């Protein structure tokens, strides 16, 4: 079978080398004679692997020593409620930048746990397409407990490439762009990310939390969502998702072998530029995001005629190009090109798009 390329927004494509290693080790991990899924999370061999994975992640992101790195359950949505319960009091005001579907979900969840959620800014229509309001137009609270934003919205493919300059501790939902390029972690109070896009399989999340923000959780926060408790127990207060942690560790080593985040950033920008250049030059395809705010991870595009969508998707599937259907809220197409997507996959998609346009455009 020829190689397939999975453009799904998540769960997403994983590096082939990682999958092959996991396959080889599935029945006999690390010489233990059993699968990694069958070993206790308290076993010294497993604990060593878990700590090594954490250190590799710290190395990749240059995480300062005054931050905890937590491996948690519940995915990104679990963090929507964990964040306000851990770093804001019930009577607090918090600022949220509303840049899309996932920001909206986070806002509605936060409203359950704090007195006021202030929407500081949002997406607007500009002369060059959809864009995020300029920071000078944001309406920030004077004493916000934190400022939350999602730097990369997967549904619309809109991104904020500059870290906001605000007084409050910054919380970022990086579920879809973590590890895609270098990042200055020291500018953030909390970074969290669901795993199923650039880290590993679905069902768990990473949270990177500044230690100075810990220690004052709301009374009702569940123990497994308590950042300080999980940090104290090395993310093993409850039995973690042992296989996902292991697989994430393999991904971190793969990223190091690729040259780290500087190399990945260059590769990802190149892949995205290939797609955007093709779409912008075409009269058959279009992208409605202002180029200054375009995502390098998720590239939505529309066909000239909606009636051709089903035919486009079936033809793509026949060519081994999977997961291109756009989100149900917006329709059209979407190519998610996370770290594991090789440039060859993007080139295969472009060849198919050009051929489809020649035949039906």
Swiss-Prot record:
Entry EC number(s): 2.6.1.52
Residues bound to L-glutamate: 42
N6-(pyridoxal phosphate)lysine PTM positions: 197
Cofactor: pyridoxal 5'-phosphate
A molecular-function term among this protein's GO annotations: pyridoxal phosphate binding
Listed pathway(s): Amino-acid biosynthesis; L-serine biosynthesis; L-serine from 3-phospho-D-glycerate: step 2/3; Cofactor biosynthesis; pyridoxine 5'-phosphate biosynthesis; pyridoxine 5'-phosphate from D-erythrose 4-phosphate: step 3/5
Keywords: Amino-acid biosynthesis, Aminotransferase, Cytoplasm, Pyridoxal phosphate, Pyridoxine biosynthesis, Serine biosynthesis, Transferase
Cofactor remark from the record: Binds 1 pyridoxal phosphate per subunit.
GO process annotations (BP): L-serine biosynthetic process; pyridoxine biosynthetic process
SUPFAM superfamilies named among the record's database cross-references: PLP-dependent transferases (SSF53383)
PANTHER family in UniProt: PHOSPHOSERINE AMINOTRANSFERASE
Purpose of the protein: Catalyzes the reversible conversion of 3-phosphohydroxypyruvate to phosphoserine and of 3-hydroxy-2-oxo-4-phosphonooxybutanoate to phosphohydroxythreonine.
NCBIfam families found in the cross-reference section: PRK05355.1, serC_1
Xref: HAMAP family: SerC_aminotrans_5
Protein name from the UniProt record: Phosphoserine aminotransferase
């Amino acid at each position: 079978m020829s190689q397939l390329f999975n453009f799904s927004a998540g769960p997403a494509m994983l590096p082939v080398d990682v999958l092959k290693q996991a396959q080889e080790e599935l029945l006999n991990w690390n010489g233990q004679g059993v699968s990694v899924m069958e070993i206790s999370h308290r076993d010294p061999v497993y604990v060593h692997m878990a700590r090594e994975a954490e250190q590799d992640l710290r190395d990749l992101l240059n995480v300062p020593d005054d931050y905890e790195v937590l491996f948690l359950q519940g995915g990104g949505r679990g963090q929507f409620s964990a964040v306000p319960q851990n770093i804001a009091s019930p009577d607090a005001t918090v600022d949220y930048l509303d840049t899309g579907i996932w920001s909206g979900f986070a806002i509605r969840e936060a409203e359950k746990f704090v007195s006021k959620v202030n929407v500081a800014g949002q997406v607007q229509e500009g002369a060059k397409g959809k864009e995020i309001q300029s920071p000078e137009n944001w309406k920030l609270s004077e004493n916000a407990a934190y400022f939350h934003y999602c730097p990369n919205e997967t549904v619309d493919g809109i991104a904020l490439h500059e870290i906001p300059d605000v007084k409050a501790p910054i919380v970022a939902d990086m579920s879809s762009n973590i590890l895609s390029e270098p990042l200055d972690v020291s500018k953030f109070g909390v970074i969290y990310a669901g795993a199923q896009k650039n880290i590993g399989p679905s069902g768990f999340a990473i949270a990177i939390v500044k230690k100075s923000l810990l220690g004052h959780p709301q009374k009702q926060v569940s123990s497994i969502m308590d950042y300080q408790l999980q940090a104290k127990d090395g993310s093993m207060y409850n039995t973690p998702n042992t296989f996902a942690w292991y697989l994430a560790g393999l991904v971190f080593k793969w990223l190091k072998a690729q040259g780290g985040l500087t190399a990945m950033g260059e590769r990802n920008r190149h892949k995205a530029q290939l797609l955007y250049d093709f779409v912008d030059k075409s009269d058959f395809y279009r992208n409605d995001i202002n180029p200054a705010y375009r995502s390098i991870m998720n590239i939505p595009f529309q066909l000239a005629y909606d009636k051709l969508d089903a035919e486009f998707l079936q033809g793509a599937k026949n060519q081994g190009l999977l997961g291109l259907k756009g989100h149900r809220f917006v329709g059209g197409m979407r190519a998610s090109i996370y770290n594991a997507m090789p440039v060859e996959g993007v080139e295969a998609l472009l060849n198919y798009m050009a051929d489809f346009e020649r035949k039906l455009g």
